[in-house]
């Protein structure tokens, strides 16, 4: 919306924007720039930097125009710049709206979301597969770039299941080494191992994070159960 700001026109309040998943710092930064020009090209400031740079002589007299797309851009930049710990704290309530499974660590989920999130409210819709594997079509296993089709995917899942089951300590590094090591041993590209495993454990064409991160977060038992389901679907 590129309209002059007015409550009469239903412009969002601060509380509305927070409820829509915008960070306080991004809102303050954006609103400060609506009626004030800091000079220079820079737009993204911390609250402390804004306080230092603010100059009454640079306030504009013309009515401000509220642009939700610009605020969204500010918000995504703030999210990317946050420490992983700060983002995990901010994201956890939104993660838990979608992921009720206690064993899925919200901090690990936050780590795969941080660079891909514009607003905190975007988070829940990306995570439904963690609690429940969705019904999916086996056509998802077809990926031309990595030369994967349903036959190759079935073969790969059957080879990878015992390898994943044999991991002694289920860490992200161990899962990574298992999958990459298999690709090296099979003499194929990493994607030919990663793609079918990721589809089997997520049931989604697009996911935050790849096969390694998702398997690690789901845990051994759930990963193996989902691979079994993938094998069963592909054998039909």
Label for each model-derived stretch:
Residues 173-235:
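Charged substrate- and nucleic-acid-binding regions of tRNA-handling and nucleotidyl-transfer enzymes
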Residues 1-79, 92-93, 195-206, 229-230:
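Alpha-helical recognition segments enriched in aromatics with Gly/Pro capping
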Residues 1, 51-59, 98, 117, ...:
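Short, mixed-charge aromatic SLiMs
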Residues 19, 76-80, 118, 165-168, ...:
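Amphipathic alpha-helical interaction elements
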Residues 84-186:
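Small-residue-rich helix-loop
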Residues 26, 70, 87, 105-112, ...:
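Residue-level detector of well-ordered alpha-helical segments, enriched
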């Amino acid at each position: 919306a590129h309209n002059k700001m007015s409550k009469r026109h239903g412009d969002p309040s601060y509380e509305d924007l927070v409820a829509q998943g915008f960070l306080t710092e991004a809102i303050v930064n954006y609103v400060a720039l609506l009626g004030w020009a800091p000079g220079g090209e820079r737009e993204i400031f911390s609250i402390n930097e804004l306080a230092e740079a603010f100059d009454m002589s640079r306030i504009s007299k013309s009515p401000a125009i509220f642009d939700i797309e610009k605020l969204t851009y500010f918000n995504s930049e703030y999210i990317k710049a946050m420490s992983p710990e700060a983002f995990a704290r901010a994201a956890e309530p939104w993660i838990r709206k979608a992921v009720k499974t206690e064993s899925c660590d919200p901090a690990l989920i936050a780590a795969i979301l941080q660079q891909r999130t514009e607003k905190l409210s975007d988070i829940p819709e990306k995570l439904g597969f963690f609690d429940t594997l969705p019904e999916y079509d086996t056509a998802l296993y077809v990926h031309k770039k990595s030369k994967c089709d349903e036959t190759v995917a079935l073969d790969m899942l059957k080879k990878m299941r015992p390898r994943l089951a044999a991991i002694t300590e289920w860490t992200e590094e161990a899962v990574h080494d298992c999958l990459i090591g298999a690709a090296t041993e099979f003499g194929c590209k990493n994607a030919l191992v990663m793609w079918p495993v990721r589809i089997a454990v997520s049931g989604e064409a697009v996911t935050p994070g790849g096969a390694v991160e998702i398997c690690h977060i789901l845990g051994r038992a759930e990963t193996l159960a989902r691979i079994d389901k993938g094998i069963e679907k592909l054998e039909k």
